[in-house]
């Protein structure tokens, strides 16, 4: 929990567009947050470590919003590892793994006005599907 909170606190730019700043309570809530009609066994919350230090976290839901789609709820790379290919490498590995087990698409939401997040997902092959309260993006796999 401390490692996740520290990673979040180091990413203040994200929280400028997605307030409020993370707390222990909000992280605990995120660990069990689910979209409608999904169960905990459909959710993965994964930490990626380098040299014993948390480098990134990934939260995704299998089979949402359709059976062949995986929804990324959160992906955050530690500030000190950004710009070094760590995030793109994780997404590349996730994409290959999901394709192998039969998924055809990955979707996610990006906060409007967050140029860093939007550019990251565009660079990794995601395209805009629609804009609501946030920008929905997808990548066909």
Predicted feature locations:
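Acetyl-CoA-dependent GNAT
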Residues: 2-80, 91-93, 97, 130-134
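Active-site acidic-Proline motif in GNAT/NAT acetyltransferases
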Residues: 78-80, 84, 112-113
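Residues forming the Rossmann-fold NAD(P)(H) cofactor-binding site
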Residues: 88
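Conserved beta-strand-loop-alpha-helix junction that forms the acyl-donor binding cleft
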Residues: 108-117
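Conserved acetyl-CoA-binding loop of GNAT-fold acetyltransferases
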Residues: 122-131
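Terminal substrate-recognition subdomain of acyl/acetyltransferases
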Residues: 134-141
